[in-house]
Design a protein with these regions (language model features):
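ATPase catalytic-site recognition across NTP-hydrolyzing enzymes
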Residues: 42-110
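ASCE P-loop NTPase helicase motor core
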Residues: 1-60
Length: 278
């Protein structure tokens, strides 16, 4: 109806939440959004101010979310809570331009009904620049190879999981042989336990810098990757493993990245003169 108005009041949680995408997203409808918090309350009581100051000292993430209305960054029971918190404090979720003088390596978790997830990384000295992320499902391998080609990066190795001998449902050939046949430099990450992979991620995470825009979806999944909090039945050995859900695939691909790069030496820039590139 003409001149109708709809009023919403909400506490932001994630930029992917429907209400946020509707009213604050890049394709938002015609809307007026006003951010209001404790600073806008002229009758803000001293008892709440004291509680707020305590939260600020004890749990800064909670303070930002509850009192300042920022998106929630850290979640209870998440696998990489400490690593993510430190990356936020050190501003390692940032803007990372692609360096055309360095090769891009890709790290895959392969699925069909589940997601195929791919991280794109460059080794810059002692740092790992995670410059891009892509995932999709129910797509043939050629779709992903075309996506890589269209990004225009100069590629190094493609790191596949240990089960890369599974067959592409469309071509009937294995992922590994199709990629080798297309001229890709294919490497296979050795099989390890999930715990070993998580340990590798913890080891290298402080060397990782992420492009917060191109890796937004992947970062979201890393933040949400969480342990199963179901109690272990009496008499059984406790096996605290992450839940297998929609966040697992990006996290699995990142484990392969960590395992592949754990022993990476600092990489030099490409010498275009030696490669006869103008």
């Amino acid at each position: 109806k003409e001149n109708s108005e709809l009023w919403f009041s909400w506490n932001p949680d994630q930029p992917t939440d429907p209400i946020d995408k509707l009213l604050r997203g890049k394709d938002r409808i015609k809307a007026v959004v006003v951010e209001a918090n404790w600073k806008d309350n002229p009758w803000f009581p001293e008892v709440l101010k004291n509680e707020m100051e305590q939260d600020k000292k004890r749990n800064y993430d909670k303070y930002l979310h509850v009192w300042e209305g920022k998106y929630r960054e850290i979640f209870e029971g998440t696998v990489y809570a400490d690593e993510v918190r430190k990356a936020i404090e050190e501003r390692r979720f940032t803007s990372l331009p692609y360096d055309a003088t360095r090769k891009v390596e890709t790290f895959w978790d392969i699925g069909w009904a589940d997601y195929t997830s791919i991280w794109f990384a460059q080794v810059v000295g002692n740092r790992f620049h995670i410059i891009d992320f892509y995932q999709n499902r129910m797509k043939p391998l050629n779709h992903y190879l075309s996506t890589l080609q269209n990004k225009g990066y100069i590629y190094g190795a493609d790191w596949l999981p240990h089960d890369s001998d599974k067959h592409d449902p469309v071509s009937g050939r294995t992922y590994k042989e199709v990629m080798l046949g297309s001229g890709r430099d294919v490497r296979v990450v050795p099989m390890t336990t999930v715990e070993q992979g998580i340990g590798a991620v913890r080891t290298i995470f402080n060397r990782c810098y992420f492009d917060e825009h191109k890796c937004e979806t992947g970062i979201y999944h890393l933040k949400r990757y969480h342990y199963d909090d179901k109690p272990t039945p009496e008499g059984l050995k406790s096996t605290r493993l992450p839940v297998h859900d929609e966040h697992s695939h990006a996290a699995d691909a990142f484990r392969y990245l960590a395992l592949a790069l754990s022993d990476a030496e600092p990489r030099r820039k490409l010498n275009y003169r030696k490669r006869n590139v103008v």
